[in-house]
């Protein structure tokens, strides 16, 4: 699931992941609908601009892109926190792969 701003970035990330990881089901939602979308879809992974308490409590793998406009991104992968100074597409794809491994 992608729920980050700006919208073009959110949709671009979703499109690229869909092309490069066709087995992954991707939902793009507005950031303000993140919590209700987590309840509705029960995603294995979320990419967002702000990690909410609901996200942290219900999703095992998530990426918070540049929180509070900070120069880094934060990921949680099965309870392990990782920071990326300049997260790249390959990093996101690797996290998608790890989310799939954890889901199986």
Please place each PLM-identified region on the residue numbering.
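Short, polar loop motifs at secondary-structure junctions
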Residues: 31-33, 48-53, 67-70
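Ser/Thr/Gly-rich flexible loops in soluble cytosolic domains mediating phosphotransfer, phosphorylation
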Residues: 61-104
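Short loop/helix-cap segments at secondary-structure boundaries that form the rim of catalytic
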Residues: 38-40, 52-60, 72-75
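Acidic, metal-coordinating helix/loop segments flanking the phosphotransfer/catalytic sites
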Residues: 29-45
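Short, well-ordered alpha-helical microsegments
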Residues: 10, 34-35, 54-55
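Short, glycine/charged-enriched secondary-structure capping and boundary segments
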Residues: 14-17, 56-63
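Short, charged N-terminal beta->alpha structural module
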Residues: 1-31
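Hydrophobic beta-strand segments of well-ordered beta-sheets in folded domains
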Residues: 1, 42-47, 59-64
């Amino acid at each position: 699931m992608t729920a980050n701003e700006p919208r073009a970035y959110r949709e671009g990330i979703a499109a690229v992941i869909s092309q490069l990881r066709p087995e992954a089901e991707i939902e793009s939602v507005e950031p303000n609908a993140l919590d209700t979308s987590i309840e509705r879809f029960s995603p294995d992974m979320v990419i967002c601009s702000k990690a909410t308490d609901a996200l942290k409590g219900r999703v095992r793998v998530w990426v918070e892109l540049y929180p509070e406009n900070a120069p880094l991104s934060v990921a949680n992968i099965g309870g392990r926190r990782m920071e990326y100074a300049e997260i790249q597409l390959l990093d996101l794809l690797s996290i998608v792969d790890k989310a799939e491994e954890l889901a199986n």
